[in-house]
Amino acid sequence: MTPEELSAAISACLKDAVSTGEIALTESAVPDAVRVERPKNRDHGDWATNIALQLSKQAGMNPREFAGILSNHLQGIPGVTGVEIAGPGFLNITVDAATAGALAKAIVEAGASYGTNQALAGRVVNMEFVSANPTGPLHIGHTRWAALGDAIARVLRASGADVTAEYYINDAGSQMNVFANSVLSRLHGRGVPEGGYPGEYIRELGDEVLKAHPGIRELTDEAALPVIRAAAYEAQMSDIKTTLAEFGVEFDVFFSEKELHDAGAIESAVARLREQGHVFDDGGAVWLRTTDFGDDKDRVMIRANGEPTYFAADAAYYLSKKDRGFTEKIYLLGADHHGYINRLKAIAACAGDDPEVNIEVLIGQLVSVNGAKLSKRAGNIIELKDLISWLGKDAVRYSLARFPADSPLTLDPELLKKHSNENPVFYVQYAHARSRGTARNAAEAGVDRSVFDASLLDHATENELLSYLGSYPSIVAKAAELREPHRVARHLEVIAGAYHRWYDACRVSPQGEEPVLDVNRTRLWLNDATSQVLANGLELLGVSAPERM
């Protein structure tokens, strides 16, 4: 029995109790799905639910009285062997081995879809993350959001949301002029201009520009700068996209700030927000009255000299997302952008959206790496591509995904390079590789999945493993709800541990001249179910599931 099947069965029992008048609720008040969880202490049963605590007040009943009535109905669910009322009204449910073991077959048959759900179906989400300036290579400061943003997008999609992963290119404004001037200066051997970009990559970009425009040095600086700006920008964005691909991060949209300006979107945004009564003029400048919606001060949109501010572009960009049909806009920003939360929410409110529903701003803390070498090529920073070459994509992505975004993080390269159980990514990947090796050995021994007898999965380690496999869908749903993919990573580690214990206690393949029995065939189902869940979870984290290690 899967958690979803038990959930539906409890809901049906509750509706029966309502229809007989034992519980005074309207049928519409009964949820179609009742949340079930694994109790922390397995002596308390296989599954637990707090539905009596949730609905008893509405029914005008004591929670334990409510639980007692529901308990009588639950006893009739096929496979349920016991129901106990605990504490103020929790229901602890025990199922027989055959009912519990049936989950293994259900997982294998579900395949890659096991763990997915439709909790967020109908939600149209724009997720903007990384959005590094196209003035240099991706570095460690961008790495955490690349890994986490992609993982969050994956768990949201696994929960039914329609997600667009978007990279906002800051290709307008003064920093692009500084960037172009830095390349120009290097082309003419002038060194780094004041306030310019250092690093060997600037020289490399100059070589790219020279290759595309051999006569660039003969032009005046004024004539050369627009050419250099365009060519160096294209080369740098190509480098960024290549690095993201190497890191396994895919974006659906690369959105240009410059195109906002060129299309007149800034002026349009000011006009729209003025029509809604949120724009005012003062001191020759145009302002947005964001203090009406919790911001600490009103924000300038158009300076007195007629130049739009970055904030104006932020407002136009938000309206673009709204116009493109995204009802939810998620921004993933670094720790130095904490002040952006209120101003972005104020923009949403000025645009007529609910800032508590239509916009979400996630702030991440910094990440560092012990012993990492600074890249002179990039101006004494740690490049993402160097990190991938040094530690491997999987180690970096998994390590970044297994911690909450708001916790500071220091990666330990020595740990991440170890092939031992101390290394979390190795521990999980090895469990998957071991399960695939077990399947190959079983095939050589003549063990197949022609028979499945769930009642044979009665060993304590099998019960433990099944319980964690059964919890996986709820973990994915919770990870999506809270934007916390680390929940998936941590649960995979729990599954890996349970699998290794089961592997040591229960053989899939017969030994020597022993015949192939139904217990071997049934255990192969459990082995393959574990393999499937580990692969599904690693996929959500953007990490490979190796066949061999």
UniProtKB/Swiss-Prot annotation:
It is an enzyme of class 6 (ligase). Its EC number is 6.1.1.19. GO terms for cellular component: cytoplasm. InterPro entries: aa-tRNA-synth_I_CS (IPR001412), Arg-tRNA-ligase (IPR001278), Arg-tRNA-synth_N (IPR005148), Arg-tRNA-synth_N_sf (IPR036695), ArgRS_core (IPR035684), DALR_anticod-bd (IPR008909), Rossmann-like_a/b/a_fold (IPR014729), tRNAsynth_Ia_anticodon-bd (IPR009080). GO terms for molecular function: arginine-tRNA ligase activity; ATP binding. It is found in: Cytoplasm. The keyword Flavoprotein does not apply. It catalyses: tRNA(Arg) + L-arginine + ATP = L-arginyl-tRNA(Arg) + AMP + diphosphate. PROSITE patterns: AA_TRNA_LIGASE_I. It comes from the Bacteria. Keywords: Aminoacyl-tRNA synthetase, ATP-binding, Cytoplasm, Ligase, Nucleotide-binding, Protein biosynthesis. The keyword Secreted does not apply. Transmembrane segments: none annotated. One of its GO terms (biological process) is arginyl-tRNA aminoacylation. Belongs to the class-I aminoacyl-tRNA synthetase family. Monomer. HAMAP family: Arg_tRNA_synth. This is Arginine--tRNA ligase. It comes from Paenarthrobacter aurescens (strain TC1).
